[in-house]
Amino acid sequence: MANLRIALVAGEASGDILGAGLMRALKAQHPAVEFIGVGGPLMQAEGLTSYFPMERLSVMGLVEVLGRLRELLKRRKDLIATLIAEKPDVFIGIDAPDFNLNIELKLRQAGIKTVHYVSPSVWAWRQKRVLKIREGCDLMLTLLPFEARFYEEKGVPVRFVGHTLADTIPLEADRAAARAELGLPDGPLVALMPGSRGGEVSRLGALFLDTAQRLRAMRPGVRFVIPCANPERRAQLEELLAGRDLPVTLLDGKSHLALAACNAVLIASGTATLEALLYKRPMVVAYRLAPLTFWILKRMVKSPYVSLPNLLAQRLLVPELLQDDATVEALAQTLSPLIDGGEEQTRGFDEIHRTLRLDASNQAADAVLNLIGQTR
């Protein structure tokens, strides 16, 4: 079996998790393999030689990106030159499309096979990016089936590999065990998940807590749990909770335990909705943006739904209350019946979970090795 040299670049923690799983699967199928590129501690533990710390790529927000733009462009230019000199058998860009798609284009022009793992949201907006993907990418690996259908229509070689979260989250979560671990009592429990970013919690935190108070008036026995993404979000939520008489348990992280423990979820639109779906917890999705941002996005977004559960179901499976529709009364009235109901949602969630549960890392490894003619 010939020695393989595989280059990978991940730009953030979620990519590091995916990359490490893919590397494990590649080694299992083709033990004589060397990994080079950029990754975090998990990928390095699997044997990646990282040219520089992954954190140098982990920037969020326009201001932060502009502040680091010169460094990012130089790192990308140097990385392209290094990889062309190293001539890997294949390059795998993991997410981070603004950084990786340009690398893929340059490497493919230099005769190196390229794979992009995790589709950017081209199906929803900025659809012209698909032209760059088609030019720079030998193979797109998608986590979600509707993404693969989009690429097929656009003539991009694609393979739907499933979602690693669907592989790791059990088909039936143990609510009683989760409550015991968190020290939460029996009775109706609602998880409030207003987002992981400061701006999201600023826009949605008070709205979600006001909704909790309204729910409490409608159903006096209901309690609440809020998983906090980090210490900053916890401090923000503690400030919003001051002066409110609400039975709320704040958790540090532990979003998966909160979802397993609860009966229903009030949740910001985002990737956490997929986790709630996989835990089969009925949900109401809410989101508010700055009015101008919402106006612009409404004209740019091509999709009829904003939440992943509805995009995956290809129908309105979960209620979406956006912008001015996201009022306390509307959220409370929509959420209340789901606390001890929501069977239609959970049936749909179970179907979707089974569709996504494909052993993603092995599927991705198969696709990569097949592309470079190294299948077993």
Swiss-Prot record:
One Pfam family in the UniProt entry: LpxB
InterPro entries reported for this sequence: Glyco_trans_19 (IPR003835)
Molecular function in Gene Ontology: lipid-A-disaccharide synthase activity; phospholipid binding
The entry's keywords: Glycosyltransferase, Lipid A biosynthesis, Lipid biosynthesis, Lipid metabolism, Transferase
Assigned EC number: 2.4.1.182
Function: Condensation of UDP-2,3-diacylglucosamine and 2,3-diacylglucosamine-1-phosphate to form lipid A disaccharide, a precursor of lipid A, a phosphorylated glycolipid that anchors the lipopolysaccharide to the outer membrane of the cell.
Identification of the protein by name: Lipid-A-disaccharide synthase
Organism: Pseudomonas fluorescens (strain Pf0-1)
Record gene name: lpxB
